[in-house]
Amino acid sequence: EQCINSGIRNFYISVHYLAEKIINYFGDGSKWNVNIEYLKENIPLGTAGALKLLPTNLKSSIIVINGDVLTKTNFREILKYHSDNKADITICAREHKLSSPYGVIEVQGIKFKSIIEKPSFSQLVNAGIYAVNPNVINMIKPDEYLDMPELINLNQKRKKNIIVYPVHEYWIDIGKPESLNKADFEWNEVTLN
C-alpha cells in the first residue's frame, strides 16, 4: 500500500516458500491498479540473489524491500535521494535505541575509568529497504545465494558509491510474532496521522 501511495506501479515479488498463497493473494495486481510479476526461486537465493531473476533490460534504479518490513517511508523520495547522490546502492537505516539494565563500567587494563548507570545507546540499523542500480544487479551470478549485506560489502570492496538514507517515518520489522502483534496495534494509529 505504501509503495502505491509513493506512486510505484510496477512490482516484482520474489517467491519460493508458500509461493502459491502469495500469488493467489496478490494476483496480477489489477485490484490495486498496479502490475505485479513474480520471480520464482527454484531454490532459495537470498535477499539479493533473487534480483538476478529480474528482467535484464532494467533502465533505472529499483527499490528492494524485505518482505517482513512495514513502513510509512516514501519510496519515491528514496529513489530521488539515490539519484541525486549518484549512488550505486542506497541503504535505508533507522535509529535504534538500546538501554542497558546495568551500570556500565569503563576500564583501562585493571584501572577504573568511569561508571555510567543504565546508559542508553543509539545506533543506525539496516531497515531492509534499498535502492539499487541495474549495474549492481548485473554483477550477481545466476543461481547464486546472496543476501543484501553480502552484496553491499562486495560493492564496497569494488569502491561503488554506497550511501545511507535515514528513515524517520514509522518502520517496524514484522518478522517475529511479537513485533507483528505490535504492528497490528500501532498501524491503525499510524495510518490515521
What are the roles of these predicted feature ranges?
Residues 23, 29-109, 132:
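Conserved beta-loop-beta/alpha segment of the NTase-like Rossmann-fold superfamily
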Residues 19-23, 149:
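Short, surface-exposed alpha-helical segments at coil->helix boundaries
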Residues 1-20, 34:
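N-terminal glycine-rich phosphate-binding loop and ensuing alpha1 helix
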Residues 1, 20, 52, 76, ...:
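Active-site phosphate/pyrophosphate- and oxyanion-stabilizing loops and adjacent acidic/basic residues
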Residues 63, 70, 76-83, 96-99, ...:
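Catalytic-core segments of class I nucleotidyltransferases/pyrophosphorylases
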